[in-house]
Amino acid sequence: MKTVAALLVVLSAVIFPAVTRADTSDRFAMGGWIEKFQPAIDQANASGELFRIRGHCQSNCTLFLGVRNVCVERGATLLFHAGHGRGPNRHVINAGSTQRMLNAYNARLRRYVTANGYLAKLEFSSISGARIIDEFGYKECPRGG
């Protein structure tokens, strides 16, 4: 019986690799500096495996919207704000960091966050995962991952 169970696990990993091996935004939920995010973004793009945005995803976590095989869970909440400097410049908007975030978003989302000033201020503005899927055309994550 244990052999059958082990075989089923292996087969499901082969048949459903995107679901069983999907990386998630969980460990990046609270944002942070680009050095923390870029290796994970590069890895996700290189592997082509599904990258799942779920739960709370703020600041640079939204960069994962630019991953080539990204999906978003309907229950996710994405929080957007302008990029900013470090140290004494932490409260100063940084055009380069802001542009990096904009470049990660598809055209519809980019137009929306720009038109509504989401990346022109340091305070968070949120968009639900359901809205990211329905209005901005991002892929919905398969259930069960």
Segments predicted by a language model, with ranges:
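Bacterial N-terminal signal peptides
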Residues: 6-14
